[in-house]
Regions:
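Extended, charged catalytic domains and RNA/DNA-binding interfaces, predominantly
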Residues: 1-226, 237-244, 251, 273-282, ...
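C-terminal helix-coil-helix/basic helical segment that borders enzyme active sites and/or dimer interfaces
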Residues: 228-230
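Hydrophobic alpha-helix feature that most strongly marks membrane-spanning transmembrane helices
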Residues: 241, 245-248, 263, 282, ...
Length: 305
């Protein structure tokens, strides 16, 4: 099957455990990705700023270096990519496509000049905050009434100028709307669900989902049980059904938050179980064209060509 997952925290996990990407005990490794047939994975650079003692930018550099090193060591299985064309070329060569995202602009010191480095790393998107507010914006749980600051607006403009996407996952509702209202291009939520289905502040209101839809962006389905509101496949399907009912055929994608949470829903234990989700949705009558959009094509559409 063809599968494109837009968010995992496997790099941070590998840094913590000393494991590599070829095979490990987490949710994502290259061997399991290869078994899917055609897989693309956006690996997020991530650190909890409240729990580390070194400069965040240094952590970002080390995690980026880890990805490059692991891709070089495992060139039989994986190819580094940024554009849709290179993802398709990796698949044609029988390899997993590995892409890079950055979860939390604090990892770039909230400095638009650091985006030159992120662009050189072939970064696809930057999540503007994690759970802590920063110089750019409030988060969903820290300063939740704070929208984009003036530096935040400048940072978003610089993102688009560098052909990267702003990710509003973790942002306050006010800040997410500020990003949308700038009207500069597609807006994404790489790993978020429906607040109407599960009333968690990390999830998107219907109006915000529709605004992301209208921007031409994508929303990656998050498999963390706390954001699903249950641990069974029915909980996952409820979010899919609701977001598709909002006209999300070209918006809804995958963003499982693999290796970023302890408990995944739907009986999924890792990337190898995405076919289980595909089968569950097919059994509910969703046709192959729609499932291909959800499982791969919607992410491909928002990448640079």
């Amino acid at each position: 099957m063809r599968c494109f997952d837009g968010h995992c925290d496997t790099l941070a996990r590998c840094m913590a455990t000393g494991e590599g990407l070829r095979q490990n005990t987490g949710h994502v490794d290259l061997a399991r990705c290869a078994a899917l047939g055609q897989h693309a994975q956006i690996f997020a650079v991530f650190a909890n700023s409240a729990a580390v003692n070194e400069p965040l930018y240094a952590i970002a550099q080390r995690q980026h270096a880890l990805l490059e090193r692991e891709c070089a060591r495992n060139a039989d299985l994986v190819r580094r990519c940024r554009t849709a064309r290179y993802v398709r070329a990796a698949w044609a060569a029988g390899k997993t496509a590995a892409l890079l995202g950055i979860e939390g602009a604090e990892l770039l010191d909230c400095n638009p000049r650091r985006l030159d480095d992120a662009a050189a790393w072939e970064c696809v998107y930057v999540t503007l905050t994690w759970n802590h507010a920063n110089a750019l914006a409030g988060s969903h749980c820290d300063a939740p009434m704070q929208g984009l600051t003036a530096p935040g607006r400048d940072f978003v403009r610089a993102l688009y100028a560098h052909r990267m996407l702003p990710d509003v996952s973790h942002l306050s509702e006010a800040a997410a709307w500020d990003v949308v209202r700038l009207g500069l291009g597609p807006v994404i939520a790489s790993h978020a669900n429906s607040r109407a289905v599960c009333a968690h502040t990390r999830n998107l209101s219907d109006d915000l989902f529709c605004a992301i839809r209208d921007s031409g962006g994508v929303v990656g389905l998050n498999l963390y049980t706390d954001f699903l509101g249950g641990d069974g496949m029915d909980a996952v399907v409820r979010h899919v059904e609701h977001l598709l009912d909002l006209g999300g055929d070209e918006t809804l994608a995958l963003g499982g938050d693999l290796d970023g949470c302890d408990t995944l829903g739907g009986g999924i234990t890792g990337v190898q179980d995405y076919p289980t989700l595909y089968a569950a949705l097919a059994a509910r009558g969703y046709d192959s064209a729609l499932l291909q959009a959800l499982f791969s094509d919607n992410w491909l559409r928002v990448l640079p060509k």
